[in-house]
């Protein structure tokens, strides 16, 4: 029996907060959690460094990132698709 293994890689959606490094973007991912004692919805956030091969994502873009093998000391994610382009001000 040869079955194709289904990939269980995590995907997250976040906003690009930095695109200063070459082929790398910093993505801020926010999530809503309920506080265990006070029952209030609290917004928690994490920053991830994601690989951007063609440097196509810019500051303010909302993108989807997928977990991958370690690409450097801090980079374990790859930018996969653009969800929403940044609004021009």
Swiss-Prot record:
One cellular component term from this protein's GO annotations in UniProt: cytosolic small ribosomal subunit
Pfam families the UniProt entry points to: Ribosomal_S17
One Gene Ontology term from the biological process aspect of the record: translation
UniProt xrefs under Gene3D superfamilies: Nucleic acid-binding proteins
Keywords, in A-Z order: Ribonucleoprotein, Ribosomal protein, RNA-binding, rRNA-binding
Top-rank taxon: Bacteria
Protein known as: Small ribosomal subunit protein uS17
Family: Belongs to the universal ribosomal protein uS17 family.
Species of the source: Paracidovorax citrulli (strain AAC00-1) (Acidovorax citrulli)
Signal sequence, renumbered to the chain: none
Purpose of the protein: One of the primary rRNA binding proteins, it binds specifically to the 5'-end of 16S ribosomal RNA.
Tagged with keyword Ribosomal protein: yes
GO molecular function: rRNA binding; structural constituent of ribosome
Quaternary structure (record): Part of the 30S ribosomal subunit.
